[in-house]
Each structure stands twice: as C-alpha cells, then as structure tokens.
C-alpha cells in the first residue's frame, strides 16, 4: 500500500450549466418533478373516491385550484417534452428498414405522435 494521495479534480455542483447538452439533459430529467406532484394528486383522488362523496367533492374542489391547474399544465407540458425527446431518439436506437431501405426518421417520429393522438382520442371517446 502506498501513502500517496491520488489527485482528485474538484468538480463544482454547477458543472453541467456550462454545457448545452447537459443543460438539456437536466431539463428533460427535471420534468419528473411536476409529474410526481400529479401522481400524488391522483393518488389522493383515489383515496377520496374510496372515502365517499364528500371527500370526492373536496378533492374535485382542490383540483380546481388555479395553482393545482397550473401544476397539472406544467406536468402535461413536461410529459410531452419528455415524449418528444424519446420519440426523436427511437430512429437512432432502433433504425427501421422496409425492403432493405431505411425509413425516414421524420416518418418514424410522426407515426409515434399519430399513435399517441389516436390512443388519446380513443380514451376520450370511451370516457
């Protein structure tokens, strides 16, 4: 064993702010924060649904609060942003070929968004 101290380069907590790629990455990962709140709100909604009509009405009034509506809008925008980043990565991760020719990346991404729109429409019709 050696008593020599290895060189450890000091890294500031804000190192990622200097690199556009890492800023984008941190922004994408931060989209989970409003989604956590949205999930907590829905969990409490399920609990109030079980407790009865009065608790359910209280939860509906809570969800009508402008701050909660704003959090839900931010969560929706965050999830759409997150989906866009994943959809744009898919053609690079899993290139699709038809008859030996690569399918255009834009077509793959647009097909994914079309699937999201179609499924959302079906859910809205059923509900």
Curated annotation (Swiss-Prot):
A cellular component term, taken from the record's GO annotations: plasma membrane
Membrane topology value: Multi-pass membrane protein
Keyword Amino-acid biosynthesis annotated: no
Subcellular location: Cell inner membrane
InterPro entries: Fumarate_red_C, SQR/QFR_C/D
Source organism, top-level taxon: Bacteria
Keywords associated with the record: Cell inner membrane, Cell membrane, Membrane, Transmembrane, Transmembrane helix
Main location (coarse class): membrane
Stored Pfam families: Fumarate_red_C
GO molecular function: succinate dehydrogenase activity
Regions crossing the membrane: 30-50, 67-87, 107-127
Job description of the protein: Anchors the catalytic components of the fumarate reductase complex to the cell membrane, binds quinones.
HAMAP family: Fumarate_red_C
NCBIfam families, per database record: PRK04987.1
Subunit architecture: Part of an enzyme complex containing four subunits: a flavoprotein (FrdA), an iron-sulfur protein (FrdB), and two hydrophobic anchor proteins (FrdC and FrdD).
Family as reported in the entry's similarity comment: Belongs to the FrdC family.
Name recorded for this polypeptide: Fumarate reductase subunit C
Organism: Vibrio campbellii (strain ATCC BAA-1116)
Encoding gene, per UniProt annotation: frdC
